[in-house]
Amino acid sequence: DPEMSRGLGDVYKRQVIGYILFPKMIFTAYQIMYQMPDIELHAYTDISLFSVLAAVACTTVATLWACLATLRETPASLMRPRTPKAGKRVFLEYIKPLWRRMSFIHKVTARNLFRYQKRFWMTVIGIGGCTALIIAGFGMRSSLLFTMSRQYDELFHYSAQVTLADNALPEERAAVEDFLAGDSRVVNYIPCAASSATVVTPSYSTTAYVEVMASDEIGKVVDLFDYKSGDPITMGDEGVYIDQKLSELLKVSVGDTFFLDGDVRGDVTVAGIYEHYTGHFIYMTPGYYENALHAGSEPNAYLLNFTSDDTDTCNAIFEKLLDMSGVATTSRMRDTQDTYMHSMERVDFVVVIIILAAAALAMVVLFNLSNINITERQRELATIKLLGFYDGEVSAYVYRENIVLTLFGILLGCFMGHWLHIYLVRSTEIDLMMFGRQTAPSAYVLSLIHISEPT
């Protein structure tokens, strides 16, 4: 059978694409977060055989379903013209003020849309799925970019961090502070007691970064906003303040307690949950640290703001600091952001693949349905040509329905795309990171442009 041979040939071509293109796409997405070796591509006989059988089975079932009604009829009935279905009123006709103002062409279009229910839902669901995929693709990219810009441009306000050695002497600490206070390139420096600790609840445990600093100082380097209301948070001595992702992992809310196991150990109470996207940070005041954990907090790190964040300025200051005894490490916030933003370039490849696949699917859906639309209504189209319709008007008669159905599909796809985007964001988040969960308006606009091109 030549058709079967052609179909199996197409299946083989698609398998080659599936074994090469999609593994690379998924692998590229994982390289955003992880350092991974080069990918090795392999073909699997069992998967290939299953895909061939599934493709043949789906094609056969669809063909039988389409031909079943025809095969049940007699040859004589098949040779006679099919009797038109009895006319039915559409719901728009019951809205008389609207129906009276519609032109004849628009009334015909409305009747045809609701007359062919299968074609209506096939087109709407098909276009809706394509739109949802494109929105999800653009939405994922905007979420990742939003995460970095929000975290490092709006929430974090410090240029660098200097960490002292564990055995730093008081005079070494004083020397570092004197240098920071006397250097004109340093706008301000905020001392804090920084350490790593394990946070534990009955259902989960993970590692977080604990920073103890005065409530009137933290606002100079970090903005804390309530994760629900967006209102600014003012730290107090009633508990610790944790990020939203950590609260979800620990399944705790304001007023709950969890165990903190670090330089000191003890139960702490959640006083607030703030908006945050990268890493886990637990903030508390020195007063609460002493009351809850029964220990004093000595500054062992400094959060710095420079007059300029350029590389030369930072390196010059870091060089002098690292030459001082008692200084262990220095880190520049811009380097962290640049590294992440560079990895975000890989997302563009994934987005392009999603957009091309969705646009191709939309074109196939519309092409096939347009052909079916014309084939099933040859007599109707011939009749309106006899009534005096020009070729352009006959084409518009058909395309007008496709455009309306596409608009319905886009509307459905906007709702589907929003929830698909949220699902993908939550599914791809790792424990140490939370992505932006709102769908950017640009994702809807760009998806509308791309889905309209095949139409």
Label for each model-derived stretch:
Residues 14-49, 410-448:
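Short helix-loop junctions at transmembrane helix boundaries
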Residues 140, 144-153, 314-363, 373-376, ...:
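Peri-transmembrane interface segments
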Residues 1-12, 449-455:
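Single conserved hydrophobic/aromatic residue that forms the stacking wall/gate
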Residues 155-156, 234, 273-315, 334:
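Small-residue transmembrane helix packing/gating motifs
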